[in-house]
Amino acid sequence: MRKLPLFMAWKFWLICLYIIKVASTQIVIKSNTIVGGNNPSGFQNGYIVSGDAFLAFQDMNTVPMYQTVRIDKGGALYYINNDKQGFSILSDHNYNHPFVFLNEGTVVVDDRRSISPGSWTIKDGSFTNNGNIMFTSSQGDIFSIGSNYITNTGFIFSKGTSFEKPQRLQIGNGNIWINTGTVCMANTTYILENAIQGGGCISVGENSVFNIYSFDMQQQTVYLSHPSSVLILNGGHEVPVYGLGNGNGILYPDAPIRDIYYDSSTGIMDVTAGTNGIYKFTVYIGAGYNESNFEIVSSIKIHGISYDNYNFVRYRGPPPNLAPSVCQPCVEIPLYSFQVPDPYTTTNELGFSETVSFYSTYNENDIPVIGNTTIYVPPAIYTLTKVNENTTETDIISRVTGMGYNGLPFTYYTTITVGEMETGVVTKTITITENKSRSTKTTLMSRNYTFSFSNYSPISSSGTYSVSTVDNITTLTDTVANVSSSGPNSIVTATMTTYQNNHEFNNASVINVTNSSNIMVPITSTFYSSVDSNLTTPITSLTRTSQSQIVSHITKLASSINETTIANTFPSPAASGTNYTTVVTNAEGSVQTDIVSHITTTDSDGKPTTIVSHITTTDSDGKPTTIVTTFPAPAASGADYTTVVTNADGSVETDIVSHITTKDSIGKPTTVVTTVPYTLCASNADYTTVVTKSNVSVETEVVSHITTTAPCSDLESHVENQTTSPSMHTTSLVGSENGVSAKTVNDKPNPTIFTEVAVSEGTTSNAGYVTDQGSSLEMFAPTGASAVESGNKVSQTQTASIFHGAGSTFKIKFNTILLSTSLTILILLGMA
């Protein structure tokens, strides 16, 4: 055996040692590692990322990619450029050891935040991808895999983010490469350099172009997944293409397309181009297409290049077939997973606690980042009391926090001073003006003295206590009444709180109104009793008592077409609880004395309350309005009295005004003033009258009388019967309320009929609003009765058939008569 020369032997061993050294110096990443800056040390000989770990090169535009780059299954490798020049990353190796790139895990090459185009290149060696790889950029980078041996069984996604600057994908160096996985494209141009073997998929997505020239693509599936996808052909072999439709298509750049032939039975489309159709290519697109929807486009611009010679064919309808199963969905690969810190709580410089929590998200460049949220927890509202030799002042202090326009937190303090209150307000008017977008609250007040107090607390846990300031006047509102159940445009009476030290400080009540959006809005108003203007000594000790005041309102349409609501306060009744009178000058100049009546009752909480009657009607503009009802004052003795009334037709009649004491629907006492025409009954004799019928016939009718109890000379009831024939007549009960029910009781054998008419509770019909209601009374009688309307616009008609004979009696009993409606009853009863 021939021995090697000594020099040659040493050379051989040196080469072996060098190879061993190169292999042994590659760094192995076994835990999550983030490296910043260009060309970090320790990675110049290659790197291997173990499973369940990642290696991230950040804030750089160039790093080594030497000899061997391997990512094990479960591992990940990230190249991330943050605000640098575009990537300049190139593979390299020693002269006798080819470069190896092997990915079993995840690789992301992210140049989206670069400020110029870059490149990531494998120039030779071998490239094997059995995992997931994403190339992404914003400036039109070139991602090139020029290895001698290329195999892809996994997923490769070339995703540009700019429509104007699509990136370029290059795979292959002229050699055949194998694809059994999926290659996805978005905002990408991919120019094929040789045929692709294997049964894989090329998915051409948004604003992407796949140029296959004339290479054999029969083993691959091309999927046009977006309406802007383009496939470029130069003739040659048959190509399977899926997803043709919605405007995407096929470009033949070398000659104008002449004809399209589609065979629905085979799913094959033949395209001829050039003079006399000398060029031809065949595309398998599948069954289900409509040949009339194919279109040859005369001019189109693709990735900045114009094609103006009928070079593009497209299908206007949707693709009839689903995506092929061999093509994986084109889903973006996220960057390395963030370790989101746990939340924590701290105390800031303002003295209140902050809770800081973290989350992972993407920024405006689709880069994952960690964000944080800070929740500010200010202390509870507290009270500070200041005392000197003259006054005691209580301050309510709260803190408000927020975020300023610069994103920084701010805090300010609010202080409400309860002290040196101005009272003695004689009148207060609240006006709410709606203009469909905002409301304005105007308060008019007059004042005449001040006082201060301390140690205030609400008088009722069921009420609402609030402190508000208007026109520099602090108002304490302590409302016991429950207004939430009250309807819109309603008057709500409440038991108020009186603070007393020989003088009064009264809270008023709450009004519910509806704004322009038909939303019920409660208005809380404060009213003060008149007090001694000479009072100068501060009141520091107050005694609580209860008193009621009444608030009503008028809603009208103002000249500016805005709804205006005016709140009015009416004084409480006199201490004796009696009605009081007021002098009113009418529009025509006459003067009359009116009585204002009231009802003293209790509210739902058992508190005493006083109600002044009111009428809801409409004003001249057709808007709802509420007015206070007054009645002419009775004689000083309180007895019934008569008054002379001039009717609209000029006739004069004498009316009797009397009072009825009864109970309302909830059993509370109520007083009703009734007005009945005064009829002289000197003789009580029957008389005749001439009646002209609607058919112009004239007849004479007999008017007879029955004496019971009615307002005559002896205050007896006078019931008239007008008889023409034993037919049905109509009875009108004028001035009654809704809903009348009747029952007939036969309590005597020869028939004495007792009919009880019960007025059921309903919505009050008020003056100025006309309501006609009717119901039928089936009374035991062959003859009828009729009545006329008198003295009121509100009428209710009862139809009755009444049987009566000798000794029969007819009686009407009203179980319930509601407040503030003058009642005139005139019954015409026919007697047999």
UniProtKB/Swiss-Prot annotation:
GO molecular function: cell adhesion mediator activity
InterPro entries, A to Z: AWP2-like_YTTT_rpt, Hyphal-reg_cell_wall_N
Record's note on what induces expression: Induced during biofilm formation on catheters inside the host. May be repressed during biofilm formation ex vivo.
Superkingdom of source: Eukaryota
Presence of the UniProt keyword Magnesium in the record: no
Gene Ontology cellular component annotations, sorted alphabetically: extracellular region; fungal-type cell wall
Disordered: annotated span: 722-747
Glycosylation sites: 187, 290, 372, 390, 435, 448, 472, 482, 507, 512, 515, 534, 562, 579, 695, 721
Keywords: Cell adhesion, Cell wall, Glycoprotein, Secreted, Signal
One Pfam family per UniProt: Hyphal_reg_CWP
Signal peptide: 1-25
Residue runs in coiled coils: none
BP-aspect Gene Ontology terms: cell adhesion involved in biofilm formation; cell-cell adhesion
Location of this chain's protein in the cell: Secreted, Cell wall
Keyword Glycoprotein: yes
Disulfide bridge partners, by residue number: none
Function: Mediates cell-substrate adhesion and promotes biofilm formation.
Protein name: Adhesin AWP2
Organism expressing this protein natively: Candida glabrata (strain ATCC 2001 / BCRC 20586 / JCM 3761 / NBRC 0622 / NRRL Y-65 / CBS 138) (Yeast)
